Structures are given as C-alpha cells and as structure tokens.
C-alpha cells in the first residue's frame, strides 16, 4: 500500500518539474541568465529517496536522502537535451544520473534509475563531474573524476584520476581503465576532444601533484593517447596557464567539452583564486587552434560567469563550475553551470557571441597600470562617440 503522503508530494513535485523558466533582466550582451535552476535536489524522483510502502515506512521518512544536484555533463541526443548530473547523497557519496528535456532551459526529468557505473577497484570511493563527448569513432564517452582513498592515517588524503566510460544511449555504460598520465601523479577536470588529432585520442588535462593542490601543475595541459581502451599520455603540453593575481592564480581546469568552431576550439573552463573567505571559482573561456589544439589563440581577461545573487550561497559558497554545454544547430549555446556545489543553472549564448567575446575582449594585462590604461582607452573612444 502506497503511503498517502506520496500523492501530496508527487503533486508538488510535478508543479516544480512543469514550471516555466524565463530570462532574467541580467544583461552583458554575452549570455542570458534564467530565473530558476534547471536541476535541484527537489527534482530527484521521490522513489529514489523514500520507501513508498506504508507498512514498512509508516511515517514516510526519507530513507536515502539527497543533498545536492550539480555539475552536469551535457549532450544533445535524439533531439533531447540530456544532462548527466552529479547527484550527492546525504552520505556524501556522489553518483551520476541522467535528466532530459525537449527544451534546454526547463522541464528536465530524471530517468527511472541513476547510472549504475561499476567500480574498477575496491578502493574507489567516489566519482563525479562527468564530461560527455560524442566522438567521431561512434561512441559517447564520459570522462570523470575518480577519487580513491590514499590508505593512510590522514583521512583527508586521497588520490584523483580520470575515469573513462562509454555508451551509445546514456543507459548502458562500458567502464574502461582510467587515464594514465606518465608525468602527472594525479588528474581531474579532464576533457576528451570529439575528433582525432594526428590519429590519436586528444585530451585536455589538469596535471596535479596532490588531491587539492596543483603544485607544479602550471594549468590546463594537452596530451594524446593511442588507444582509448588503455589510454596513456606521456607528454602534456600546457595551454591556458595559471598566472599571479588573476582569476586562475590558484588553479584552473577544463570545463565543458571543447566546441569546434570556424575560428578554433572554444573552451569554457574554470579558474580559481584564493580569498580571505576561501577559494572562489569562476568560469572563463579561451580558444585554441584547430590544427594545433595546444596553442591558445584567444583568451579574454577576467571571467565569463561568476556567482551572482543567490548563486553565491550553498554547500561551497562563492563557486560556479561547468562541465557541460550543448550547441544547437542554429548556433545557440547552452552552458550548464552549478552554483556553490548545490544546484544547476543554464546560461544561453551563441557561437557568434562567444567568439566575439573571446577575440575582441582585451586579454588580462596582468598589472594594474596596464589594466587601467585599457579602460582609459575604451573611455576615450566612447567619449569621442558621445
């Protein structure tokens, strides 16, 4: 017998799932923000959280709670917008779940079950932040962070690597061995390009000395692997690098799967700087050369997206993060970004707007005197027009 509370809660959830999502008044000429998040913990199906049987759950208590839904890979599949979200339980363990809609800004509903991804080893503790790539070899690849216990007395220590799985339908997944980078002890925030480069699988990487600190890792790397089923990268060339007193001073990493455009590979990434209140994550972009994807050919100064209003507050405040974007046939770009490790939003731009932003916004001049000069030059040109 189903508990009567289920019907009440199901009706409330249906109203949430069916609500319209409208643009806000926010304006910068680059992208539009939307009023509501596209995914939250309230979007999770009730039968994932509650035992619906009144006999075994007379008080209708939540048995397997959900803490947050955020950081989602994204792909257009069978004319539907599909998100592979990071879902975090009350027990802190993350798992992947597919939500889909026929619209890119609203109406996302989770499939009947989450993704059942097998572990490769017994010490694999957590998985999260999947990037999705529709590769020219015919497979959809998911590249994600795998967290393993370091097996030491310090419980805060862990080892991060890049896991790889592939699918044709986002339902049935084949787990492949983790990516091996011979010159980097740890990896996370890895993306796979959708095309072969010199006949090899091409990755943007993030070399790390430790689980949290990048150490000697200078920024976002680029490397090639001969075989995706046993992916090994020897050399990593640096692309977008960390710089002092910028949005990437502490660390940076790849975000959404790179987007191929006529002018280059459009990369939507994240940068991190330290503050008195902790790490601040923002989203920025850069463009790499089509034939030599390790060469940065445009990198505007500052951030593209930063925490705004209510986005500033959550489990890990003052953070925005992306690992998924979808490009429509008309050139519209849906950037799915999480705020404060709690919920998932969408910003909508276009290829033309993002390329204009990337190539025509001044690069970071790195010093206050030069940055003020950039601004004064803009002011002077505008005054001449007024």
UniProtKB/Swiss-Prot annotation:
Temperature dependence (free text): Optimum temperature is 50 degrees Celsius.
pH dependence: Optimum pH is 6.5.
EC primary class: transferase
Keyword Cell wall biogenesis/degradation applies: yes
GO molecular function, one term: hexosyltransferase activity
UniProt keywords, alphabetically: Carbohydrate metabolism, Cell wall biogenesis/degradation, Glycosyltransferase, Transferase
Catalysed reaction, written as an equation: 4-O-beta-D-mannopyranosyl-D-glucopyranose + phosphate = alpha-D-mannose 1-phosphate + D-glucose
E.C. code: 2.4.1.281
Record-level GO BP terms: carbohydrate metabolic process; cell wall organization
Highest taxon, organism lineage: Bacteria
Additional notes on this entry: Both RaMP1 and RaMP2 (Rumal_0099) catalyze the phosphorolysis of a beta-1,4-mannosidic linkage at the non-reducing end of a substrate, but acceptor specificities are clearly different.
Subunit: Homodimer in solution.
Protein name: 4-O-beta-D-mannosyl-D-glucose phosphorylase
Lineage: Bacteria, Bacillati, Bacillota, Clostridia, Eubacteriales
